[in-house]
Amino acid sequence: MIRQIILIVSLIGISNAAYQCKDNNGSNVDWFVFYKLPHLWNHPDNVPISNGTGFLYFDVNNKNWKLMPQGMDVENNAVYYTLQQYYNSNMNTTFSYMYNDEWPDSTIWSNSSGHAKGVTVFDQYTGFWMIHSIPKFPSKDMFRFPSNAHYYGQMGICISYNTVSLATIAQQLFYYNTFTYQFNLPQSFANQFPVLSQLKNKEYNKSPPLTSTKVLKSLGGQHFRHFAKTGEWGKDLYSDFVGPTLKSSIKVETWNHQSGDEYNLPSVCDPNHVQSTMSAKYIRLPYAIDYSSYEDHSKFVVAYSESSSKPPIPYVCIGDINRQSHQIHRGGGTMCIYDQETYFQFANIISETVPCTKATAEKATLTVLLIAIITFFK
């Protein structure tokens, strides 16, 4: 009887205090995805889209893209409700961690730390991890959608977790070298998760292995696979880690702008048609929304098959690092979900990819040949 009473009291505590992702109605949700649309002038009848705050949304309870009537700049959307828990939190009992390579409400930015953006908030029971691509977001004192985020497309994913998962989350973030602007670490969390103190002290992993992939189970039981890399690894997260690990060809949408010595990494065509990495060129969404990758700052991956006789592996990944030359020397990561319904929503979003150049195709062929020769003589 006493054990039953303790269980009931514990459940009451969880329902009253525990942090989770919230949906567009402010209700708890296991996970959600948002796709903030670019500033699209060709949708004058839709004010949020035309002013750059419109967004598509879906979550575990309704796996269909829904165009929301409100913009992301107002106080009645999933991101707002989720973050509001942090703004209303008790700092004595809440662990919170905000990182962004461009700090909000500031001109401070970093081109050497991890190219990573996110928020993680936990109490003793549960919490959430929100991974996104929005520069200068969120503010650490109140919800405000930054004006710089209106023009380009942005994406994010929020996942609810039991607090025991914070151990794995922290270990993954330890690879990033995050540019941290808010970190609240109650002593109870420091005692339970020692790596958090290292993160607070701006430490990060510098010794092999320089990459890590871990499976994380959400509060509702959904399995996600997270990929993390350090800048010291010096390779592309997508073509050198995600694709080979998933054993699949992938299409990748990331920032498609070049400047100075920072150039876009080319698409990589696998001569065996098993493990290509193709950069996005055009995006096509429901509701007659389409635009060039040049207008998008999102970072997401869609697995695909190059064989008509082999079905694609239903993986979708959402993260925060680009396929650019400079970013092979920066930390970052992506969160992948293996789910057929989610995959269906993403499968055709990347409507056209950047073709491989002759040089990259020849390099890929030579690499395969060298591997075959080395294997033969082993």
From Swiss-Prot:
Signal peptide feature range: 1-17
Enzyme Commission code(s) on record: 3.1.-.-
One Pfam family in the UniProt entry: DNase_II
One Gene Ontology molecular-function label: deoxyribonuclease II activity
Annotated knockout phenotype: RNAi-mediated knockdown results in accumulation of apoptotic DNA in 1.5-fold stage embryos.
Residues listed as glycosylation sites in the UniProt record: N51, N92, N111
Keywords: Apoptosis, Glycoprotein, Hydrolase, Nuclease, Signal
Top-level enzyme category: hydrolase
Keyword Cytoplasm: no
Signal keyword on record: yes
Gene Ontology BP terms: apoptotic DNA fragmentation
Task performed by this protein: Involved in apoptotic DNA degradation.
Family the UniProt entry places it in: Belongs to the DNase II family.
Name of the featured protein: Cell death-related nuclease 6
